[in-house]
Each structure stands twice: as C-alpha cells, then as structure tokens.
C-alpha cells in the first residue's frame, strides 16, 4: 500500500479543547476525591458502606485519569 493512498489520521477530539477538558475533568475528579476523603474521615466503622466507598473512588479515579491524559496531550506528550 502506498503512503499517498492512505488517509491521514485525525483525532476524535479537537486539540483546541484539550485545555478545557483538562480543567473540567480534573476539577470533577478533585471534587469526588475530596468527597471520598471527607466521607472516610467523618464516618465510623459502623456507618461505612463499602459500595459507596468503591463507587466514589471509582468515579474519582476515572475523572482524574482522563484529566491527566488530556493534561499530557495538552503539554505535547502524546500517549
């Protein structure tokens, strides 16, 4: 296959929105991280719910992970 015959790859996300996605995703992730921390500090061992802990931590890690991904893309580290 010739190089000229191949179509150029275009990103599904416009690079102009990388900064906005970074800030929004990291802010949401920090909110859920803070919520998880406050929940852990203020609850006793009798009032803790493992499913709530797992859900909050999963959501926080997903938002923080994608936020860091777009941060890396924003600064030019293409992963």
From Swiss-Prot:
Pathway: Protein modification; protein glycosylation
One family name in Pfam for this protein: Ost5
Membrane-spanning ranges: 17-37, 55-75
GO CC terms: cytoplasm; endoplasmic reticulum; endoplasmic reticulum membrane; membrane; oligosaccharyltransferase complex; oligosaccharyltransferase complex A; oligosaccharyltransferase complex B
GO biological process: epithelial cell apoptotic process; inflammatory response; protein N-linked glycosylation; response to endoplasmic reticulum stress
Tissue expression profile of the protein: Ubiquitously expressed.
Chain positions with N-acetylmethionine modification: 1
A GO molecular-function descriptor: oligosaccharyltransferase complex binding
Membrane topology: Multi-pass membrane protein
Positions of disulphide bridges: none
Primary location group: membrane
Keywords: Acetylation, Cytoplasm, Endoplasmic reticulum, Membrane, Transmembrane, Transmembrane helix
Subcellular location: Membrane; Endoplasmic reticulum; Cytoplasm
Similarity comment text for this entry: Belongs to the OST5 family.
Record function comment: Subunit of the oligosaccharyl transferase (OST) complex that catalyzes the initial transfer of a defined glycan (Glc(3)Man(9)GlcNAc(2) in eukaryotes) from the lipid carrier dolichol-pyrophosphate to an asparagine residue within an Asn-X-Ser/Thr consensus motif in nascent polypeptide chains, the first step in protein N-glycosylation. N-glycosylation occurs cotranslationally and the complex associates with the Sec61 complex at the channel-forming translocon complex that mediates protein translocation across the endoplasmic reticulum (ER). All subunits are required for a maximal enzyme activity.
Subunit structure: Component of the oligosaccharyltransferase (OST) complex. OST exists in two different complex forms which contain common core subunits RPN1, RPN2, OST48, OST4, DAD1 and TMEM258, either STT3A or STT3B as catalytic subunits, and form-specific accessory subunits. STT3A complex assembly occurs through the formation of 3 subcomplexes. Subcomplex 1 contains RPN1 and TMEM258, subcomplex 2 contains the STT3A-specific subunits STT3A, DC2/OSTC, and KCP2 as well as the core subunit OST4, and subcomplex 3 contains RPN2, DAD1, and OST48.
Name of this protein: Dolichyl-diphosphooligosaccharide--protein glycosyltransferase subunit TMEM258
Name of the encoding gene: TMEM258
